């Protein structure tokens, strides 16, 4: 893949993971199972590690957890509730273990092992032996006070014998049998309610003369036990919480050394002594071989438990070393969660279709007999490009093995049973416009080169209004398709988006928008979003044009040399080559874009109709290029804003163009080593602020 394609992949994964986070943490309505999420997250991590210059500032890999709901009182945690780093392979467990071999007599205290419960993290406070309050994890720093609801859970102790102030942490979950009973109750209630409704309606039928007015809602079942637990814990009525029989398991005490608890195994024993529910399957392993043995042993029985379990938690047992071992911004370094392999399924291909994207690239999709993967029904999977189909000898009618992996839709990983004698025939023409497809030099993907291809243009418009570009929030791809295909509106070009206000009468006649005041509100929301988007940062507008190789980072660097889009025409090769990440290919792509009369018309239109916001507050750091490594006193996004606001250039990686590398750490990270090798000055956060003061003087 080209850099631009990789960048688009990273943006796509990041946006989708944000969407999943919102559903999972804030709405209690997960769209995918945890294994699918973990695989998506893992693919993003791998891409970021491989292409550090393409890491997004708002990457979900930098965020601890959920946003805080507004349903319950926000409460700050006394100590952050961090998540755990994850391992997927045996080799990653061995690497984790290597970090501790420096300690003498390691086998004497070893590692505690516990199953990873798929529930909702909770922190409960006790004082003088009494239950005081319960707080959800939230974003790791601030959670929700759900004390009244947690108090209804039967196995959560309301009184303990330990009298000192104590904070314990664990998981609230719903047993599998309880979840099944709850869904059965929902079904029975549904039938009972609607039988009565139908009976009453039948009695009135001679008057109504029609069944068309009888409206019966479809019952809403909980897809899995975690959904049921999440929906229950955030109920406004504590009586409902009590009736649904939630359960708990605890595994942590905050500041255990203050309670004279020296090992994690002692913590678990203390919790049990105080009548907290703890997992009975807890082990102590002396070394990496024993860790893997216990992980493999538990995998054989994990489905026999009443709780959902997707992993195994390994903690360095000796607590007084935890602070010394330390933390990242998201994880403790002394613990890790081993995640079990993703579930696979076999199914039969019913059809293979080709789809065209914004750049014209063709993706093949397999449509197959629906199968269940971790409580999710799937019936489509990506086949990537024709080379993948050819290499794996895939055709309609073959039986395949699929896995919910690092894609928004599942992946085909192999042929399970070959039922045909041939391979699927290569698509030669664009599925949208029927143009002959091409394979550019250096690529394996096929491309549609027709600039007027309808689907390409729809995808281009969708990209332009997306969050990382113009962020026109209410103009969905569904709306774009409607306006694009309308005989009068014909929203075919970017300029047409800003002329949509001239077609309000036509929009009101469209069935989707017609009649109701609610639908008129939809129209107003779209138009208001478009007007709001006219005040835009130049870097976002440039990125929204979709020029190959010029994503958000390159656009940000490029806009340091221009004040409007038309200034691009005046930049020399020398100007462009002085920009970090810009090479001959990027220059070629930019020149190709600017050579089009159609694109020049677009540039002129945007310059005349948009108000470019100036993000710079000063020029103190003009022509200085900064990179960052390690943790700082403020978030990386905030630090980046200071650099950009003062005219500096921010880059995710160290290169020959880097002026300073900012780091508070004395450790020799990869970035620090590269900076020193290239005679780039490494400065602390304090030295950076001193530099700002000097420039100001």
Swiss-Prot record:
It catalyses: NAD(+) + (deoxyribonucleotide)n-3'-hydroxyl + 5'-phospho-(deoxyribonucleotide)m = (deoxyribonucleotide)n+m + AMP + beta-nicotinamide D-nucleotide. Residues 616-697 form the BRCT domain. Zn(2+) binds at residues 430, 433, 448, 453. NAD(+) binds at residues 34-38, 83-84, 114, 137, 171, 315, 339. One of its GO terms (molecular function) is DNA ligase (NAD+) activity. Pfam families: BRCT (PF00533), DNA_ligase_aden (PF01653), DNA_ligase_OB (PF03120), HHH_2 (PF12826), Nlig-Ia (PF22745). PROSITE patterns: BRCT, DNA_LIGASE_N1. It comes from the Bacteria. GO terms for cellular component: cytosol. It is an enzyme of class 6 (ligase). Its cofactor is Mg(2+); Mn(2+). Its EC number is 6.5.1.2. Keywords: DNA damage, DNA repair, DNA replication, Ligase, Magnesium, Manganese, Metal-binding, NAD, Zinc. GO terms for biological process: DNA repair; DNA replication. The active site is at 116 (n6-amp-lysine intermediate). DNA ligase that catalyzes the formation of phosphodiester linkages between 5'-phosphoryl and 3'-hydroxyl groups in double-stranded DNA using NAD as a coenzyme and as the energy source for the reaction. It is essential for DNA replication and repair of damaged DNA. NCBIfam families: PRK07956.1. Belongs to the NAD-dependent DNA ligase family. LigA subfamily. This is DNA ligase. It comes from Mycoplasmopsis synoviae (strain 53).
């Amino acid at each position: 893949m080209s850099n631009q394609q990789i960048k688009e992949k990273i943006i796509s994964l990041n946006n989708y993971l944000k969407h999943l986070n919102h559903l999972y943490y804030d709405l209690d309505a997960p769209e995918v199972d945890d294994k699918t999420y973990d695989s998506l997250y893992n693919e993003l991590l791998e891409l970021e590690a491989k292409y550090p210059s393409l890491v997004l500032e708002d990457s979900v890999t930098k965020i601890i957890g959920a946003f805080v709901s507004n349903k319950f009182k926000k409460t700050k945690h006394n100590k952050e509730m961090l998540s755990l780093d994850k391992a997927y392979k045996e080799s990653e467990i061995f690497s984790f273990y290597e970090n501790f071999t420096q300690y003498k007599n390691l086998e004497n205290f070893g590692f505690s092992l516990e199953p990873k419960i798929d529930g909702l993290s909770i922190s409960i406070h006790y004082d003088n032996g009494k239950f005081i309050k319960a707080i959800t994890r939230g974003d790791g720093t601030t959670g929700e006070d759900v004390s009244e609801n947690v108090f209804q859970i039967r196995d959560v102790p309301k009184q303990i014998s330990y009298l000192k102030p104590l904070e314990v942490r664990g998981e609230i979950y719903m047993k599998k049998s309880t979840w099944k009973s709850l869904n059965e109750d929902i079904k029975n209630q549904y039938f009972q309610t609607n039988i009565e409704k139908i009976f009453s309606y039948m009695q009135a039928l001679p008057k109504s003369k029609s069944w068309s007015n009888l409206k019966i809602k479809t019952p809403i079942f909980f897809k899995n036990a975690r959904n049921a637990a999440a929906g229950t814990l955030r109920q406004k009525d504590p009586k409902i919480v009590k009736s649904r029989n939630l359960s708990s398991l605890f595994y942590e005490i905050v500041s255990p050394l203050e309670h004279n608890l020296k090992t994690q195994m002692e913590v678990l024993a203390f919790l049990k002594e105080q009548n907290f529910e703890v997992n009975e399957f807890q082990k102590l392993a002396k070394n990496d071989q024993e860790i893997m043995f216990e992980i493999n042993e538990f995998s054989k029985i994990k489905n026999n438990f009443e709780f959902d379990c997707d992993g195994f938690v390994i903690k360095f047992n000796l607590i007084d070393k935890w602070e010394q071992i330390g933390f990242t911004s998201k994880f403790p370094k002394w613990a890790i969660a081993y995640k079990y392999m993703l579930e696979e399924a076999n199914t039969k291909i019913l059809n293979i279709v080709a789809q065209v994207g914004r750049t014209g690239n063709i993706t093949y999709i397999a449509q197959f007999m629906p199968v269940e993967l971790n409580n999710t029904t799937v019936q489509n999977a990506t086949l990537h490009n024709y080379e993948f189909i050819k290499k794996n000898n895939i055709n309609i009618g073959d039986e395949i093995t699929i896995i919910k992996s690092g894609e928004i839709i599942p992946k085909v990983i192999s042929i399970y049973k070959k039922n045909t004698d041939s391979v699927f025939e290569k698509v030669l023409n664009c599925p949208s416009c029927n143009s002959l497809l091409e394979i550019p030099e250096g690529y394996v993907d096929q491309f549609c080169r027709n600039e007027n291809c309808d689907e390409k243009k729809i995808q281009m418009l969708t990209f332009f209004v997306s969050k990382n570009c113009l962020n026109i929030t209410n103009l969905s791809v569904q709306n774009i398709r409607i306006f694009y295909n309308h005989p009068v509106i014909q929203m075919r070009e970017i300029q047409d988006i800003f002329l949509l206000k001239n077609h309000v009468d036509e929009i009101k006649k469209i069935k989707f928008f017609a009649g109701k005041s609610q639908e008129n509100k939809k129209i107003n929301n779209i138009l208001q979003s478009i007007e709001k988007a006219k005040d835009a940062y130049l870097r976002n507008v440039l990125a929204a044009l979709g020029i190959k190789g010029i994503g958000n980072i390159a656009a940000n660097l490029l806009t340091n040399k221009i004040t409007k889009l038309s200034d691009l025409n005046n930049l020399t090769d020398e100007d462009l080559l002085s920009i970090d990440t810009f090479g001959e290919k990027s220059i070629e792509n930019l020149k190709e874009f600017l050579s089009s009369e159609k694109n020049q018309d677009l540039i002129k239109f945007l310059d005349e109709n948009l108000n470019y916001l100036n993000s710079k507050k000063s020029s103190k750091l003009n022509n200085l290029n900064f990179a960052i490594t390690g943790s700082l006193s403020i978030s990386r996004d905030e630090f980046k804003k200071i650099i950009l606001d003062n005219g500096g250039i921010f880059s995710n990686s160290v290169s020959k163009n880097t002026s300073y590398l900012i780091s508070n750490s004395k450790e020799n990270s990869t970035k620090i080593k590269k900076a020193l090798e290239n005679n780039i000055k490494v400065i602390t956060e304090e030295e950076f602020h001193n530099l700002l003061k000097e420039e100001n003087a």
